[in-house]
Amino acid sequence: IICDDIPYFLLFNLHNDIYRTWHIYKWTPTRSLMSEEWSQSPENTLLSLRHGITHSDGIELDIRLTSDNELIVHHDSVVSIPKDRLDGRSKWVESWTLEELKQQGFCSLDDLLNDSVIENQWIEQGKMVCLEFKRPHFMSPKGRGLFKKSRQVNTLSTAMKIAESKLDERGIPNQNSVFYSFYKGMKNIIDEQSISRNWAGLLPSVPTIGTRT
């Protein structure tokens, strides 16, 4: 699997239908994969993900839960826009609604599922899509803070359950997706929520501090 922002992490203990150990390698676009006219789109946009799934064996999505319990494709814990565009709003992704984030140019999981190119590649062409569920920042309203570890777990649990429901509704084959997170408590969430999708825990278990968690 090739991804554009994960350098040399190891997936381990991939469960359910697939019992293999996979390596994820950092992808550097080359001209052999694309035409002279191609220019790289910003990461985690519909255009970049459409290009990625068309020209590779699969793609990775960074999934976060919005304030209205929708799923947005967004890597960083803070909204990836210039500070002067925050207009006094919270910087944490989980504080924004789906519509507010889409107005800033970010795409949702529904946008991907509604895209005919991605749907064809994902289902008909058998491409793999890895969904990395991002834990909210320590200080985010959906984060754990000092004494609210359960809040963080609830955020991940809700996001995974919603994602599973959406993929099931669209008929995404189980073997064409995997849920994962840099979180040592993945198994507990999978068991408690009865998630049937393939899943994996990632190492290391990344602390929820900084801006690129």
Features from the language model and the residues they span:
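Phosphate-group recognition and catalysis centered on beta-loop-alpha active-site segments
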Residues: I1-T213
